């Protein structure tokens, strides 16, 4: 949600101002089937025409795993049937998309258990198409029969215009720098596991729980939960013949994740990961990219952090460097701690700001509403007033906006500049299917707008003024013919005008602006 | 958590330091030998096996790519173990090794030997027989494979007797499939049979914001189901995936299984017929109406001829098909029952105690979106009804003979959420608590009682006869959870009770010995750190043997084996 999207032009607003009960005539409507994994639908330019195409993962008993590519034509239309079908061979575990070959459009990077390959979707076969790029023992070794994983957002670590790969291996990470002619060079290997720590010292996560659900005639269902001491020998001893015979294989292998991100002032991508420090607390580690594009063998900066709660990396103050957020929840009480990035280091023992919220299912994002590089904080949560629930079976969704801080030490203002409490009853449940989108400048006034599903399922857009107030009435609305469960707004054809992607239950509708 | 539970460890610890109050500290237990051991730090597990087939249990230590055997000596050779060095060990090379143990493979001389088997790099299966207490040279069992057994070294239960001929066969995991290799008497293999497998795979290779997440893969591959479904005495193969329900009947001649299923149900086709979920078709006044899109398949003998029949439920329609010795007669259902309402599930169970399985059809009342909103804030109840269609021999009665109602009572969602937080806090508080490792074993010779062993930092305390012998497994009957009886038709499950009574027990065994003096105290050679007690039976006598695992560090892991002396 924090990603900065380029401002969209005024044309869309001019065309959409006013209400409409159906798709605008200046928008080309296309509909395609969503398949089993609607969240995995991708948008990339696959044929090099500067228009985004759709990639839909698909599985069938006959064809196995496929990527269905729907190419957008010059008129903004998507065909009902896929333009290309890319077979995913059984050995493939994951894929990514990058511009690797001189031919226009993006190619596929295919990741198998022991190597990485490239493939063009423009060629219908693997023959004379599949190219081995390099060997790498991936952290995952067994492919899923029905689904192929997608690795999004390949970084350009050194700014040379070529996609790079930060790949987890069996025991460590490898940074592969991309170059011309599909060349990838292993530039750095590092472990995200603290190698200095004696395995005997690694905290074992406190007590284990032994849960037994017993059924007996006297007490009915009896739930017995017993605490077991932390043990370095859990499951260590067993008898060969007592083994579980319902499982052919059970195995798992995990390591802390690493993220490529800009962490200091030098405009280069660095590497961040979290593990257990020598003091047995959680620890954030930063490997900073040096001027020559190299990395040190050990982290340039480390800092201890309490690992309870969700720990996220997010640029909250718009300086282009990722900050650290720690979000703690206790039923309906939430505490958010902001730790600002200080040129590649943090004061993790002392948050720069602490904010507290009361509600359920808190959602947090930052968005540069005014487009001035100073993001506002958006908070959304639900409350369930008992009186409302009993009287008319309804809940309340609250949307709050906090302006950038104006006082010293404030990341965001302590009090919300805007608050919207909406009551949703059982009849208005369609309005709950998607959160309010604050990332798009729909009317082209240089300010983001609030796009939301109204209680009746109508998609509406309201302006947000300089005081972060939502306009009382929408400047645009669209009444879909089918329920919208999720929506995205993106410029699909590069004309600077926002296009709409509406996700229904079994299909999606694309509304692409036309001249 | 009671105050007593909190204080118990603290009470026990000072007691252990008062020699006047306690038994003399010693370095072993009466009737036991104490065998300290130090193993390489990378040892991942110990397996108890009788590798030399002498009736005494040996210890196989498994480390990445290295298998080490410690044989138990017979009393004639001094008994016990020598943990100073393995008696035999082998090193396996490969990035992916799935291993298994078996007694059903002959060695090069044709004698049946305990063997280590390994699927190496997914391409070949090797066997290392144990001969004269040594790993013999490997024997090629099968090669030219294309398999996935996960990265690293993993236990792979891939060698088992599928066709009950006394020879182990092989189940080789592939990409979403299992290849079954039936071994012939001459050590050759029949052409492999490929069956689909719904592997449970959880993979994460990338994180965007949440850096506390890990990357890697968790994998579980279920074994195939084998049982005789057509009453010919030979195990048949039942393969279930999301898409298909396949049955391969064993054949009397030629290859054991046919290459295609003897009969199958296409679950995709059923789902297509029932229709896909569409939000726009959802009846907000009856969300449970979605159950009409569900289906289930039961393979079970209904008519008592020993051959499994097929019960197919599609929404509220239940069809019964007849099993034959050669397959399933899907041409015409023997019976079709239709139920109105929202059918949740069906199963077969003898209700009227006539020895024949009856059909239980469960329905759930209509639930609206309004109900869900209401239950967010206030407690609710859902009635589930069971209709029992008695088995009349060839089929079920047209009308149910009995109707049961189960009221499922639950607290509001808000209350459940707050209870979940309370439970999480209870679990978190355990991080601060001292929980002593304990084990219940038979150290003394009293059959009717058991002894409690408590592992402290520097000693093991033994409280003789302090625990009850394990009770025979209760003869739980069907629906015992509801206090079920044939004379009662109204039942209740109250989830609120679970929440109200929820408590995590700590040191519960120690309550039984509160105030008691341990009969034995065993001094430990090194301090215990995150250790554990494990009970085993290694030499066949009536006394349990005890592994005392003390600590594992960068260089080694250490412990103590208390081995009873017969």
Predicted regions and their residues:
Chain B
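Positively charged n-region of N-terminal signal peptides that target proteins for export
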Residues: 1-6
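Beta-propeller-forming repeat regions
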Residues: 23-566
């Amino acid at each position: 949600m924090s990603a900065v999207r380029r401002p969209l032009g005024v044309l869309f607003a001019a065309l959409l101002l006013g209400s409409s009960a159906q798709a605008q005539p200046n928008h080309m409507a296309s509909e395609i089937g969503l398949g089993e994994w609607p969240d995995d639908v991708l948008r990339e330019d696959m044929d090099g025409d500067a228009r985004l195409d759709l990639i839909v993962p698909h599985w069938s008993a006959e064809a196995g795993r496929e990527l269905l590519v729907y190419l957008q034509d010059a008129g903004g239309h998507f065909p009902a049937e896929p333009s290309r079908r890319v077979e995913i061979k059984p050995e493939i575990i994951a894929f990514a998309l990058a511009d690797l070959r001189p031919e226009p459009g993006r190619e596929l990077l295919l990741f198998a258990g022991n190597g990485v390959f490239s493939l063009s979707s423009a060629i219908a076969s693997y023959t004379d198409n599949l190219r081995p790029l390099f060997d790498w023992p991936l952290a995952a070794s067994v492919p899923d029969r029905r689904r192929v994983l997608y690795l999004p957002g390949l970084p350009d670590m050194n700014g040379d215009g070529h996609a790079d790969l930060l790949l987890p291996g069996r025991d460590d990470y490898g940074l592969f720098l991309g170059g011309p002619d599909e060349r990838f060079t292993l530039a750095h290997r590092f472990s995200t596991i603290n190698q200095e720590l004696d395995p005997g010292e690694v905290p074992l996560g406190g007590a284990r729980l032994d849960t037994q659900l017993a059924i007996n005639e006297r007490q009915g269902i009896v739930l017995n939960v017993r605490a077991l001491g932390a043990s370095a020998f859990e499951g260590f001893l067993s008898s060969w013949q007592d083994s579980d015979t319902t499982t052919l294989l059970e195995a798992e292998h995990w390591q802390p994740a690493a993220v490529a991100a800009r962490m200091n002032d030098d405009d280069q991508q660095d590497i961040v990961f979290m593990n257990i420090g020598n003091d047995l607390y959680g620890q954030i580690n930063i490997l900073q990219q040096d001027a020559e594009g190299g990395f040190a063998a050990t982290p340039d900066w480390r800092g201890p952090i309490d690992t309870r709660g969700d720990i996220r990396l997010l640029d909250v103050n718009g300086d282009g460097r990722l900050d650290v957020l720690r979000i703690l929840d206790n039923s309906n009480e939430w505490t958010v701690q902001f730790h600002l990035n200080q040129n590649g280091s943090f004061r993790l023992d002392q948050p720069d700001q602490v904010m507290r919220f009361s509600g359920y299912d808190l959602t947090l994002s930052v968005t540069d509403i005014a487009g001035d590089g100073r993001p506002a904080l958006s908070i959304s949560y639900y409350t369930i007033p008992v009186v409302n629930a009993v009287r008319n079976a309804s809940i309340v969704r609250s949307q709050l906006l906090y302006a950038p801080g104006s006082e010293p030490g404030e990341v965001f203002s302590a009090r919300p500049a805007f608050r919207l409490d909406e009551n949703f009853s059982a009849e208005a449940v369609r309005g709950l299917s998607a959160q309010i989108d604050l990332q798009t400048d729909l009317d082209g006034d240089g300010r983001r707008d609030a796009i939301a599903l109204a209680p009746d399922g109508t998609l509406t857009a309201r302006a947000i003024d300089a005081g972060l107030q939502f306009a009382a009435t929408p400047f645009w609305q669209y009444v879909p013919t089918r329920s919208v469960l999720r929506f995205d707004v993106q410029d699909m054809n590069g004309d600077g005008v926002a296009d709409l992607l509406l996700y229904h239950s079994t299909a999606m509708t694309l509304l692409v602006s036309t001249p | 958590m009671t105050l007593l539970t909190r204080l118990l460890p603290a009470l026990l610890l000072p007691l252990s330091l008062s020699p006047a109050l306690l038994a003399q500290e010693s370095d072993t237990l009466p009737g036991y030998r104490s065998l300290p051991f130090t193993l390489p730090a990378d040892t991942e597990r110990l397996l108890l096996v009788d590798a030399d087939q002498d009736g005494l249990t040996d210890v196989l230590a498994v480390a990445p790519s290295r298998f080490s055997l410690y044989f138990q000596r017979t009393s004639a050779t001094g008994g016990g173990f020598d943990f100073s060095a393995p008696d035999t060990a082998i090193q396996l090379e490969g990035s992916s090794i799935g291993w298994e143990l078996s007694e059903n493979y002959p060695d090069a001389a044709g004698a049946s030997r305990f063997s280590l088997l390994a699927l190496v790099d997914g391409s070949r299966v090797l066997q290392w027989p144990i001969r004269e207490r040594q790993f013999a040279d490997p024997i090629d069992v099968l090669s030219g494979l294309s398999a996935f057994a996960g990265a690293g070294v993993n236990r792979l239960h891939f060698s088992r007797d599928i066709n009950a001929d006394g020879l182990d066969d092989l189940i080789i995991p592939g990409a979403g499939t299992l290849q079954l290799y039936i071994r012939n008497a001459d050590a050759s293999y029949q052409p492999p049979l490929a069956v689909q497998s719904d592997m449970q795979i959880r993979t994460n290779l990338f994180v965007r914001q949440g850096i506390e997440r890990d990357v890697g893969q968790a994998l579980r591959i279920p074994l195939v189901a084998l049982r005789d479904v057509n009453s010919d005495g030979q195990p048949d193969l039942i393969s279930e995936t999301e898409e298909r329900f396949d049955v391969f009947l064993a054949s009397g001649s030629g290859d054991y299984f046919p290459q295609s299923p003897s009969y199958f149900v296409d679950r995709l086709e059923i789902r297509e017929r029932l229709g896909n979920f569409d939000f726009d078709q959802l009846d907000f006044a009856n969300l449970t109406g979605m159950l009409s899109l569900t289906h289930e398949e039961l393979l079970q003998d209904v008519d008592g001829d020993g051959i499994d029949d097929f019960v197919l439920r599609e929404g509220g329609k239940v069809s019964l098909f007849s099993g034959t010795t050669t397959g399933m007669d899907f041409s015409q259902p023997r019976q079709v029952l239709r139920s109105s309402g929202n059918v949740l599930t069906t199963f077969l169970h003898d209700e009227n105690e006539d020895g024949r399985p009856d059909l239980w059809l469960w329905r759930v009342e209509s639930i609206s979106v309004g109900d869900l909103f209401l239950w967010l804030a206030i407690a609710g109840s859902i009635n589930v009804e069971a209709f029992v269609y008695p088995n009349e021999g060839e089929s079920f009665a047209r009308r149910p003979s009995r109707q049961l109602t189960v009221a499922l009572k639950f607290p509001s969602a808000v209350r459940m959420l707050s209870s979940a937080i309370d439970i999480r806090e209870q679990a978190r508080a355990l991080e601060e608590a001292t929980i002593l490792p304990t084990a219940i074993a038979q150290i003394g010779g009293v059959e009717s009682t058991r002894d409690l062993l408590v592992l402290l930092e520097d000693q093991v305390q033994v409280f003789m006869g302090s625990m009850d012998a394990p009770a025979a497994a209760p003869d739980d009957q069907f629906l015992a959870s509801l206090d079920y009886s044939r004379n009662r038709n109204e039942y209740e499950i109250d989830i609120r009770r679970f929440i109200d009574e929820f408590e995590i027990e700590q040191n519960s065994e120690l309550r039984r010995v509160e105030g008691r003096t341990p009969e034995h105290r065993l001094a430990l050679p090194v301090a215990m750190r995150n250790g554990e007690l494990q009970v085993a039976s290694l030499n066949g006598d009536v006394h349990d043997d005890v592994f005392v695992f003390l600590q594992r560090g960068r260089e080694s892991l250490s412990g103590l084996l208390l081995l009873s002396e017969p």
